[in-house]
UniProtKB/Swiss-Prot annotation:
F(1)F(0) ATP synthase produces ATP from ADP in the presence of a proton or sodium gradient. F-type ATPases consist of two structural domains, F(1) containing the extramembraneous catalytic core and F(0) containing the membrane proton channel, linked together by a central stalk and a peripheral stalk. During catalysis, ATP synthesis in the catalytic domain of F(1) is coupled via a rotary mechanism of the central stalk subunits to proton translocation. HAMAP family: ATP_synth_b_bprime (MF_01398). Pfam families: ATP-synt_B. This is ATP synthase subunit b. It comes from Campylobacter curvus (strain 525.92).
Length: 169
């Protein structure tokens, strides 16, 4: 620092020679200025450095807090992305499960419908057979009542069977 000041002041000494003219007190003024500037710098340097350092620390603190917020937001973003991926996997498994359940339910409904149809057909066949037997029984009973009601008609067994077969058939 002293060398810089000396180099700065050296040209003043070189040009400050007297020419036999008016005596200017440039050297004294320059020395007074340098001395004043040096004292001023001595007293103000530490507060200026402290002020500058506090500003640097303040900016560094803000930068650190911003970086911390950025890290936290990145963590939240990563967590949200993980949850989205889990939700996608969960949704696809739910869709697959729903499809399987729908297929199983459709098969069960089809099987139940087939069983119900078979039961209805069996019931219809049984009812039809019952009605045929009932009708046959009524016809035979009617014929027999007609035959036994009339005394004049004497029929042997073969004729009776033929008559019944004609009525039924």
């Amino acid at each position: 620092m002293r060398i810089k000041i000396l180099l700065l002041v050296l040209p003043f000494f070189a040009f400050a020679s007297e020419h036999g003219g008016v005596n200017y007190d440039i050297i004294e003024r320059a020395l007074n200025f340098l001395l004043f500037f040096g004292i001023l710098l001595y007293f103000i340097a530490k507060p200026l450095k402290d002020l500058y350092q506090s500003r640097i620390d303040k900016i560094a603190g803000k930068l650190e807090s911003i970086q911390e917020k950025l890290r936290a937001s990145k963590l939240k973003k990563d967590d949200a992305l993980k949850r989205v991926e889990e939700a996608k996997l969960n949704a696809s498994s739910l869709v697959e499960t729903a499809r399987k359940e729908a297929v199983n339910l459709a098969q069960k409904v089809k099987k139940d419908a087939e069983l119900e149809m078979a039961n209805i057909q069996k019931s219809f066949k049984d009812q039809k057979d019952f009605e045929e037997r009932k009708t046959t029984k009524n016809v035979v009973s009617e014929i027999l009542n007609d035959i036994f009601a009339s005394d004049s008609l004497k029929v042997d067994q073969k004729e009776l069977i033929n008559i019944i077969l004609k009525k039924v058939g």
